[in-house]
């Protein structure tokens, strides 16, 4: 009885390592299978990811959350990346801008004496 219990306990302890090995066969979530050749409107692109996996690609993420793989060597892809980077740097510059001039106080405390 003790031998059976000890064997069962040993199998339970080894199970996590055996199951972990099976998961390595699953493809990664963001891997590209094929590349988009048709030009994507730049105004629909929110951001992009440069993918260096089995297939080198640029993954564009649209404003609706769709992920589209494209050839990083295509001219339209390079132009889209420049545009998206330009928008990001413009937003960053606007966020870093400090307003000049005096600002009025927004505190409107009223003191009553009686």
Curated annotation (Swiss-Prot):
It comes from the Eukaryota. This is Lymphotactin. One of its GO terms (biological process) is positive regulation of leukocyte chemotaxis. Expressed in activated CD8(+) T cells. In the thymus, expressed by medullary thymic epithelial cells. The gene is Xcl1. Belongs to the intercrine gamma family. Disruption phenotype: The thymus of knockout mice shows a lower medullary accumulation of dendritic cells. Animals have a defective generation of naturally ocurring regulatory T cells. Residues 1-21 form the signal peptide. Disulfide bonds join 32-69. The keyword Ribonucleoprotein does not apply. It comes from Mus musculus (Mouse). Gene3D superfamilies: 2.40.50.40. SUPFAM superfamilies: Interleukin 8-like chemokines. InterPro entries: Chemokine_b/g/d (IPR039809), Chemokine_IL8-like_dom (IPR001811), Chemokine_XCL1/XCL2 (IPR008105), Interleukin_8-like_sf (IPR036048). The keyword Lipid biosynthesis does not apply. Coiled coil: none annotated. One of its GO terms (cellular component) is extracellular space. Residues 100-114 have a biased composition (Polar residues).
